[in-house]
A protein has these predicted regions:
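Conserved small/polar residues in nucleotide/adenosyl-binding loops
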Residues: 184-191
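Active-site neighborhood of glycoside hydrolase catalytic domains
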Residues: 140-160
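Active-site groove signature of glycoside hydrolases
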Residues: 78-87, 111-137
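Aromatic-lined carbohydrate-recognition surfaces of secreted/lumenal glycan-active proteins
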Residues: 118-128, 156-171
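Aromatic-lined substrate-binding rim segments of carbohydrate-active enzymes
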Residues: 23-34, 43-82
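An active-site-proximal structural segment forming one wall of the substrate-binding cleft
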Residues: 59-71, 95-120, 146-149
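Boundary/entry segment of secreted carbohydrate-active catalytic domains
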Residues: 1-32
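Surface-exposed, active-site-proximal loop segments in enzymatic domains
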Residues: 47-59, 84-99, 129-137
């Protein structure tokens, strides 16, 4: 698991020391993954700094840079977008579901450009650790709404995963969704 927090501080390589830190972090992660002969890598992308606004051009450039650098590895990527790494999603997520939908659309444009290296997108940006639980947007209706927005924004070649069998059943029950694009991730002990 490799985590990155998108910011508005980094601009272009060589002009900001933060890019050097990011590049060093990515290089170390790619090298670690390669030395372990990993074929899959989970990247967590934290959007917390943008809970109250759209992602900026700098943040989107940062996401693109992260994905481009990971293309140097032999790993396929599992991506999880989140607003919380500390189990406090209700205090760190956007106040309005439309902001999450906007973030989904913004990120999907870049993900589609890197679809050949992406195995799947895990979750729908909400919940503690991005795991779709303990969110203010946890109702079945809201989860289907968010899933529909993300699925409609992603290229058909990018799979999506939900957290539990119940979430999978709910999404499949929405008659406009194609089950060929879905996987479900087994629950963790935190789901109890």
């Amino acid at each position: 698991i490799y985590g990155y927090t998108l910011t508005d501080e980094r601009q272009t390589a060589g002009q900001n020391p933060a890019w050097s830190v990011l590049d060093t972090k990515i290089s170390a992660a790619v090298a670690q993954s390669e030395s372990a002969n990993d074929r899959l890598a989970l990247l967590q992308i934290n959007l917390k700094q943008f809970a109250d606004r759209d992602l900026t051009e700098n943040a989107l450039a940062e996401l693109k840079h992260i994905l481009t650098r990971w293309e140097e590895s032999s790993c396929s990527l599992i991506l999880r977008f989140l607003y919380d790494w500390d189990g406090n999603a209700q205090s760190t997520e956007p106040n309005d579901i439309s902001q999450i939908e906007k973030h989904m659309r913004q990120c999907a444009q870049i993900l589609n450009e890197h679809k050949d290296n992406i195995y799947l997108v895990q979750g729908i940006f909400i919940g503690n650790y991005g795991e779709m639980h303990h969110s203010r947007f946890s109702s079945e209706e809201e989860q289907i709404q968010l899933f529909t927005v993300l699925r409609g924004s992603l290229d058909d070649e990018i799979y999506m995963a939900v957290r539990t069998p119940a979430q999978l059943r709910a999404v499949l029950a929405a008659d406009h969704l194609d089950e060929g694009c879905l996987l479900y991730t087994s629950p963790s002990p935190r789901d109890s």
